[in-house]
Amino acid sequence: MKMVSLIALLVFATGAQAAPVASKAPAPQPAGSDLPPLPAAPPQAAPPAAASAAPPATTPAADASAASAADAVVDNAENAIAGSDVATVHTYSLRELGAQSALKMQGAATLQGLQFGIPADQLVTSARLVVSGAMSPSLQPDTSAVTITLNEQFIGTLRPDPTHPTFGPLSFDINPIFFISGNRLNFSFASSSKGCTDPSNGLFWASVSEHSELQITTIPLPPHRQLSRLPQPFFDKNVKQKIVIPFVLAQTFDPEVLKATGILASWFGQQTDYRGVTFPVFSTIPQTGNAVVVGVADELPSALGRQAVSGPTLMEVANPSDPNGTILLVTGRDRDEVITASKGIGFGSSTLPTANRMDVAPIEVGARVANDAPSFIPTNRPVRLGELVPDSALQAEGYAPGALAVPFRVSPDLYTWRDRPNKLNVRFRAPPGPIVDVSRSSLNVGINDTYLEAYPLREPDSPLDQLLHGVGLGHRNNDSVQQHTMPIPTYRVFGQNQLLFYFEMAAMVEPGCKPGPSTFHMGIDPNSTIDLSNSYHITQMPNLAFMASAGFPFTTYADLSRSAVVLPEHPNGMIVSAYLDLMGFMGATTWYPVSGVDVVSSDHVNDVADRNLIVLSTLANSGDVSQLLSNSAYQISDGRLHMALRSTLSGVWNLFQDPMSAINSTAPTDVESTLTGGVAAMVEAESPLASGRTVLALLSGDGQGLNNLVQILAQRKNQAKIQGDLVLAHGDDLTSYRSSPLYTVGTVPLWLKPDWYMHNHPSRVVVVGLFGCLLVVAVLMRALTKHALRRRRELQEERQRT
């Protein structure tokens, strides 16, 4: 077996891609779940070198770096084979890889694909693709096919059978040498028929079921313990799914160590971004796999032995129970040095050495200013779309190129005078020459799955141009760049947003059935801009939707320097894990480590009274923090969460504060729960310790539901369900309420304060209008009275003279 593997590696060294090289596949093993899940990405076409049904050469394309890396890869493969007794087999459906529905191809959209990754510490030894689907019975079997490729390497061909439109399951073995760290599985459709057909019609099609399966067998590679490889091996950026990173803490609660751990969790969250990450907490080193150990050197687990350190230290060592596992030590002689060591990763990851150990020098981090999170687009100037995505992400190809997405984040507390909309300046280029019918083709623009505007690819001719074209003197320049400015309503902009551009192309109708080009390009100019500079930062709270979409108001300062986390004096592992998950969420939201947050126990809340507070607790241990919810409509007593009933007067007052509350949300009259069985609650209210500050309480009866509650925050599909000031969560079931008084966070210029005060408050407008009318009446009465008195005196004087 080793000899076969070496032969395969020699093939790789001479002409294969620079990728992990597999040995000959071992005997099939039972399916297992030890392999980290393959990533799921939105289904999108990953265009190959040529979108054609003709199969490419079966020999992988040569890579310039393959030969130089071959020796190292051979050694890795030999070591992996020598040290691995059991291979891991896992089966993934195309839905698990990102296909939300069947991959459908037709004449105008001939390419569908999926992207997925293989962890760098895994070696693929065998793979198989099992596909099923259907093809149009109108297709000609001799000239129509679906070609399957992996990283532009031929896998197989599907041919139509007019008498049996459905096919499968069909099995295709995949050469493991085709796999790389980031993979593209493509399905390319080619069709032809008798006669002349419009490529945009839906008569000729093929579809691959999302239930088709990819089976992969892997074995682990020997670990490369180099700090410069971080975040590997804990996280591989080619893996798109949620990540699990175990943490080991010597003591369950230590404010300084938990602060250092929070910095690390937020950095990992920054790296994982949209994928999501969770941090289970242990007191001992896991028996298998990787883990992060944080603590003072003298308090580290005994299984690691006595580590000699002379200051803040980062170190990677082998898992004592698993030679393939890596333990990252973040340590020092005291707690301050542990925090410094964590900053070495949070702020110095780009300078980490290739060695497995590093002494960290003190790091000074500058103070942050409000609303400067690296992930938030600035609101003081127009922002180029080229700053948000690569230029290649703004280019489209073919008749049905799919939507071009431009994601962006912004602080959700934006307010404009009289709800004036923001501006989007779009510049785009239509295909040159008579390729498509530009008069019937258009660019559709939307935001957050909401339609905004559509523009034809060629602007309508003026009457003079039409006259010149009629006599053959005019000239149309289809290659010109069009520019349009459109409004973006303020209510369409949230914390997480996505601009969508979709080119809808209409094929030219050529006489004599002349074939048109199959490949043409169009695109959005990277100099197109989105402008939020007419916005100010002010909003009404509580509003848990802002927390879900952008971590607001805590992320107003990217390092959370105006925030503190309040934990019980003796928290259990589930509460500490929920705290780390929340810090990971903050890091993924701001792209910045939470170096400014303070961690305190519930009996030291007054030390951070001037900050926004995040409380994580069980109801049984909430005695010291229940007073922090005194400004809310909810109370904690006897191990239960109660809602305080409104009086008629408070209801009237709420009407003046928020007249839409009765429409926007459900305000219950009574809520009582023990929050057990995995149920958790998230409550937001104004802090009783400082006006304008926020308290966010994450509560559970036994701590079991806290991790689920934090994970829900990072799931975009659930964000629309998170509203108001109370959310009850049980699994994916969410219920939102709004009952607490409102308060204002932020400021506006003096000239804008009247507009803010009247905004969405017709009752205030009525009251001010009445006062205005009374004032006008009083002024008029005074003026008329003075005029009458003066007229009376004049009449009296005139009578006296006569």
Swiss-Prot record:
Cytoplasmic side: 786-802
Signal peptide stretch: 1-18
Top-level division of the source organism's lineage: Bacteria
GO cellular component annotations of the record: plasma membrane
Topology of the protein relative to the lipid bilayer: Single-pass type I membrane protein
Compartments, record wording: Cell inner membrane
Disordered: annotated segments: 23-63
Keyword field: c-di-GMP, Cell inner membrane, Cell membrane, Cellulose biosynthesis, Membrane, Signal, Transmembrane, Transmembrane helix
Pathway it works in: Glycan metabolism; bacterial cellulose biosynthesis
BP term (GO), one: UDP-alpha-D-glucose metabolic process
Ranges in the topological domain labelled Periplasmic: 19-764
Cytoplasm as UniProt keyword: no
Residue spans crossing the bilayer: 765-785
Pfam families reported in the protein's UniProt record: BcsB
Gene3D superfamilies noted in UniProt: Galactose-binding domain-like (2.60.120.260)
Entry-linked InterPro entries: Cell_synth_B, Cell_synthase_bac
Composition bias, Pro residues: 36-46
Comp. bias (Low complexity): 23-35, 47-63
Main location: membrane
PANTHER family xref list: CYCLIC DI-GMP-BINDING PROTEIN (PTHR39083:SF1)
Biological role: Binds the cellulose synthase activator, bis-(3'-5') cyclic diguanylic acid (c-di-GMP).
Quaternary organization: Tightly associated with the cellulose synthase catalytic subunit.
Family: Belongs to the AcsB/BcsB family.
Name of the protein this chain belongs to: Cyclic di-GMP-binding protein
Species, as recorded: Komagataeibacter sucrofermentans (strain ATCC 700178 / DSM 15973 / CECT 7291 / JCM 9730 / LMG 18788 / BPR 2001)
